[in-house]
């Protein structure tokens, strides 16, 4: 997903008070009654709200071209909320709304437009509270305690559609074919759009649109829809509705296939860290029944147990999968953490901003690359030494990049709070249960623990055991590394207490935590080392890195590590710095099935390519890991991705980025190039006991 700058909408307001797009010279909704127009064209045109009652699944998926002011979405949400209130026992429990918008509105313009419909005010306020920054790609927004999922894709719809993952194929129940009139926005209304709509629509799915233009009708028919002309809204004589009678088969990348779980009513999560807790909650939002097993006496005893951790995105200026993922992950994490705080979930934190310093030529070059993209200043901004120092409260000694929405939080506090919340929602927790063996027996997974503990059986299992992930037979070949890290806890001083934001250099230093009057400085990075003992050398190294990176100023001399307060954890790292999330791949079967994958793709006929089977995985076995040093940033989104995959839902990233998160990616990349796959990676050997 290319992080091209997203241009926001430029509006004017006509005499009727209707917003007008300066880009397209067209109104956003009817001058007569925008709300009634939405009901007539899009809801009634697709058979809603009456269709809610007969919908056979727990989730109903809508897609829209042109989010605009959000009027269609808000109207649908209001009608769905009324339906749920009147029919609490209905099968349908959740809405998933996917919308594409080339020119997103400023939140102030949204508020002005929403003011026309006081009956939608409570819904509109919730939307505006989570309105995302103008960043390219998908913004997943969770509303109504997870009953509403909104995927806002910012960018040109016809640029985005070819990048979408196979998880969107044959999924959409109803299309709101909106956007400005074909005469005003001719680039959108084309064959590519109509074909993509058909590919994404499930058999029996519908569409409606305000236009009755002949080329639109013919294009939709050629794509596979049955199209009907019906009475338009107000003075408009006709509009189009239609149904897709049969499934449209589309080309896929089966080697990166993401299977859903067969059963979500009996899921075991192995692990006691932040990603385990977030995954449990993401599954529970969808109705899953979850049991958690943790080797320790309480949660957050591993890498999630630190006092303070920095939250900021990982950028590299390459517009690649890594930058796409961490841009989405960071913004999603902030939205989710803010929602938790609003719900009264308490954890130490400060959204004080993060500054990444250009402390030498190498770091300066990296930051210059990061800034090649024209980021919104609310997301990332180049700053001089003077600007950074003013924000930080201390002389930063260098120029750098500032992340105003970043900050720090207490991973230990957060993990404990999330576990408590998941338990309140029905999760069963078993502590001091260290998994020894995982075996598939009679279509279930048998979990074997210590000698005095009975084996457990579950339909579906998620492994979230951090650096221990490669210990099991099924995950032994994954190229994961264990990396020891020691964080030093240093007492504040009158000078250090002036630090107002997180500083990142060849390490990091946090502002003082008011709860304990200490800062955190770290962290060491010892690859292949899983020991968690205190080490004086690493304590001193944490201090020395700060002194070495900021030699021009004297205040770092205030850092005192002599009381030897520290905490050591072990990260689970991957050489490409991206997490692994999805079904656990079957290593032996992958190599056997795909040994000639490159030849079949490059030289095989169409039928041979179409016959390539989906990637082999262990049945009902999933994983999330490899979060490295960025778990606070990545954990919320990878948990959401895994839960959505397991429930067979659309995923909130493009196909290229999702492929880069697939646990089989290293093997598949080599096989696609016709290169041999090593039996085991040295990185894996380092992390095994």
Curated annotation (Swiss-Prot):
One of its GO terms (biological process) is methylation. Residues 270-689 are annotated as: FAD-dependent cmnm(5)s(2)U34 oxidoreductase. It is found in: Cytoplasm. It holds the Pfam family Methyltransf_30. One of its GO terms (molecular function) is oxidoreductase activity, acting on the CH-NH group of donors. Residues 1-245 are annotated as: tRNA (mnm(5)s(2)U34)-methyltransferase. Catalyzes the last two steps in the biosynthesis of 5-methylaminomethyl-2-thiouridine (mnm(5)s(2)U) at the wobble position (U34) in tRNA. Catalyzes the FAD-dependent demodification of cmnm(5)s(2)U34 to nm(5)s(2)U34, followed by the transfer of a methyl group from S-adenosyl-L-methionine to nm(5)s(2)U34, to form mnm(5)s(2)U34. This is tRNA 5-methylaminomethyl-2-thiouridine biosynthesis bifunctional protein MnmC. It comes from Yersinia pseudotuberculosis serotype IB (strain PB1/+). The gene is mnmC.
């Amino acid at each position: 997903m290319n992080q091209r700058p997203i241009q926001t909408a430029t509006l004017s307001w006509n005499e009727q008070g209707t917003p007008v797009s300066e880009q397209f010279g067209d109104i956003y909704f009817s001058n007569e009654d925008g709300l009634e127009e939405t009901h007539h064209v899009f809801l009634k045109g697709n058979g809603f709200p009456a269709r809610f009652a007969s919908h056979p699944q727990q989730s109903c998926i809508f897609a829209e071209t042109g989010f605009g002011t959000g009027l269609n979405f808000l109207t649908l949400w209001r009608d769905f909320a009324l339906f749920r209130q009147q029919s609490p026992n209905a099968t349908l429990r959740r809405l998933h709304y996917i919308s594409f918008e080339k020119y997103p509105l400023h939140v102030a313009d949204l508020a002005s437009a929403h003011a026309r419909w006081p009956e939608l005010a409570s819904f509109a306020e919730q939307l505006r509270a989570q309105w995302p920054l103008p960043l390219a790609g998908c913004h997943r927004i969770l509303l109504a305690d997870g009953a509403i999922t909104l995927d806002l894709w910012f960018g040109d719809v016809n640029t985005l559609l070819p990048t979408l993952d196979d998880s969107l194929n044959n999924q959409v129940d109803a299309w709101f074919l909106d956007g400005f009139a074909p005469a005003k926005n001719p680039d959108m209304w084309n064959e590519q759009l109509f074909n993509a709509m058909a590919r994404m629509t499930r058999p029996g799915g519908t569409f409606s649109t305000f236009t009755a233009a002949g080329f639109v009708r013919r294009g939709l028919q050629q794509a596979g829809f049955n199209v009907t002309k019906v009475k338009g809204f107000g003075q408009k004589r006709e509009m189009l509705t239609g149904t897709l009678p049969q499934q449209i088969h589309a080309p896929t990348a089966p080697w990166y296939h993401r299977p859903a779980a067969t059963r979500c009513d009996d899921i075991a999560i192995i692990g006691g860290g932040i990603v385990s807790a977030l995954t449990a909650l993401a599954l529970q939002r969808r109705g899953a029944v979850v049991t958690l097993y943790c080797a320790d006496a309480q949660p957050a005893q591993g890498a999630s147990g630190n006092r303070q951790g920095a939250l900021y995105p990982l950028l590299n200026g390459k517009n690649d999968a890594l930058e796409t993922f961490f841009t989405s992950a960071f913004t999603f994490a902030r939205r989710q953490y803010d929602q938790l705080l609003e719900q009264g979930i308490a954890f130490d934190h400060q959204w004080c901003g993060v500054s990444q310093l250009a402390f030498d030529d190498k770091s300066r070059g990296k930051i210059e690359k990061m800034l090649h993209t024209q980021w919104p200043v609310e997301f990332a901004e180049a700053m001089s030494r003077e600007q950074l120092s003013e924000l930080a409260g201390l002389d930063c000694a260098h120029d750098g990049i500032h992340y105003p929405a970043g900050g720090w939080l207490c991973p230990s506090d957060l993990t404990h709070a999330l576990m408590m919340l998941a338990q309140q929602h029905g999760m069963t927790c078993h502590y001091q249960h260290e998994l020894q063996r995982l075996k598939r027996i009679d279509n279930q997974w048998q979990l074997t623990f210590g000698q005095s503990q009975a084996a457990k059986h579950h339909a579906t299992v998620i492994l979230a055991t951090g650096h221990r992930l490669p210990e099991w037979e099924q995950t032994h070949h994954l190229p994961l590394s264990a990396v020891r890290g020691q964080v030093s806890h240093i007492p504040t001083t009158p000078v250090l207490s002036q630090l107002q934001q997180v500083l990142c250099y060849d390490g990091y230093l946090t502002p003082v935590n008011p709860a304990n009057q200490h800062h955190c400085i770290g962290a060491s990075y010892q690859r292949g080392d899983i020991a968690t003992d205190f080490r004086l050398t690493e304590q001193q190294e944490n201090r020395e890195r700060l002194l070495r990176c900021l030699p021009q100023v004297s205040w770092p001399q205030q850092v005192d590590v002599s009381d030897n307060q520290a905490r050591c954890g072990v990260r689970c790292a991957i050489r490409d710095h991206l997490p692994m999330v999805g079904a656990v791949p079957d290593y032996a079967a992958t190599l056997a099935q795909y040994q000639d994958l490159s030849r079949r793709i490059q030289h095989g006929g169409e039928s041979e390519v179409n016959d390539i089977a989906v990637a082999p995985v262990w049945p009902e076995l999933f994983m999330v890991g490899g979060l490295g040093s960025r778990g606070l940033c990545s954990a919320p989104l990878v948990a959401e991705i895994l839960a959505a995959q397991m429930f067979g839902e659309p995923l909130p990233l493009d196909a290229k980025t999702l492929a880069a998160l697939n646990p089989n990616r290293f093997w598949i990349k080599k096989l696609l190039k016709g290169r041999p796959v090593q039996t085991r990676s040295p990185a894996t050997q380092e992390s095994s006991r």
